[in-house]
Every structure is written in C-alpha cells, then in structure tokens.
Amino acid sequence: MNLAIALDSPHPGLASYTILPRPFYHISLKPVSWPDETMRPAKSTDSVFVRTPVEAWVAPSPPDDKVAESSYLMFRAMYAVFTRDEKDLPLPALVLCRLIKASLRKDRKLYAELACRTADIGGKDTHVRLIISVLRAVYNDHYDYWSRLRVVLCYTVVFAVRNYLDDHKSAAFVLGAIAHYLALYRRLWFARLGGMPRSLRRQFPVTWALASLTDFLKSL
C-alpha cells in the first residue's frame, strides 16, 4: 500500500515521514487556542476541517463523508479520555468515550503492561507505526469488529498517557493519526453501517438509549 503523510513541525530537526494511506493528508503542528466551538467540521462543499488542539486534520472530502466523521468522533472520544474532559462531546463520541473508560477499568493491568513495554522507543513515527502493528495483529485475531476496535482505542489512549501525559500536542497527533487510520482501514464497514453513530446504536442499543436519555435530560 502506498503511504504518505507530511509533517510541518515547529520543532527543529523533526523530519517528514510516511505513515498514512493516500490521498495526501497534511498535518500541521502549530500552537492554537482551545475554544470548543472550533472543534467541528467546517461547512465547506469540498473539504472537511476537523480542528483539534493542534489544528490537525484537513481531508479533501465532503462534509458528510463517513470516513471523516468516524475519524472525528473516534479522536474526540479518545482525547476526552486522555484529558478526562467530556465537556461538549457529540453524543456518539460521548458513548464511545464511556465505552473506552469502561474497558480500561476492566482490563487496566493488561493495557498498562502493553504501554510500559513500548515506552521510550523513539519519535512519533515509531510510536504510530508500533500502534498500527498492534492494530494489524488484533485484526488478524478472531474478534468481532467492536472488540478489535475497543482494544486498539484503549491501547492508544493508554499509550498516549504513558508517553505524552505532559505533551498534549504530541498526544493529539498520535490519537488523531490512529483515529484517521482506523476510519480509513474500516471505511467500508463504517459506510455499510451508516457511519459511527448508527453502528454504535446497533452494537450498543442499551448504552445508546441511556446516553440519549441522559443527554435529553441535561438539555431540559
């Protein structure tokens, strides 16, 4: 598979490298403010801008693109777990965030051991490549789709906490890269289920109903 990504970093000596599938995605690590209202897809007919604390993802696709939507929701959920801040999460991201937290509580020791084994191994490119290798190994095992996805999301969050607890820009880079990779890797599956929100409703109907009720009550 032809892989490409460009890194425009303010840190001297940090070279460009290749990790993500084409079409070309440009990631710019520039310091920005953190107003919640900027973290939403742009209303553009030819591109989707999903803003993160590092001014991250720019993809040449329409606003209703399921890959971009899935990438956005997975990033928001993982970053909320990382920062312990669920404020203003879209409902699908909130449900996924709660599921990640529940899985982390259940298998805390397993994920912690995995993250500790891979600490201090190199730069961001090495970290992302390692997580992708874990993702491929999990997908080769005999799990259902959501079990695989849950393992990778949980491992990525723990990995970010272990290596980037005091560096939110780097953490957002890793979380966002994996979210984008997951969305692209499973794009046909997400599209068949109608995107992340519908797939969450199908896989976790009780959880979704409770989250919807909670969200409704908070809005009263």
From Swiss-Prot:
Assigned keywords, A-Z: Apoptosis, Early protein, Host cytoplasm, Host-virus interaction, Modulation of host cell apoptosis by virus, Oncogene
Subcellular localization, as worded in the UniProt entry: Host cytoplasm
Pfam families per UniProt: BALF1
Lineage top rank: taxon: Viruses
Cellular component terms (Gene Ontology): host cell cytoplasm
GO biological process, one term: symbiont-mediated suppression of host apoptosis
Functional note: Modulates the antiapoptotic activity of the viral protein BHRF1. May also play an active part in oncogenesis in Burkitt's lymphomy and nasopharyngeal carcinoma.
Oligomeric form and interacting partners: Interacts with BHRF1; this interaction modulates BHRF1 activity. Interacts with host BAX and BAK1.
UniProt similarity note: Belongs to the Epstein-Barr virus BALF1 family.
Protein name: Apoptosis regulator BALF1
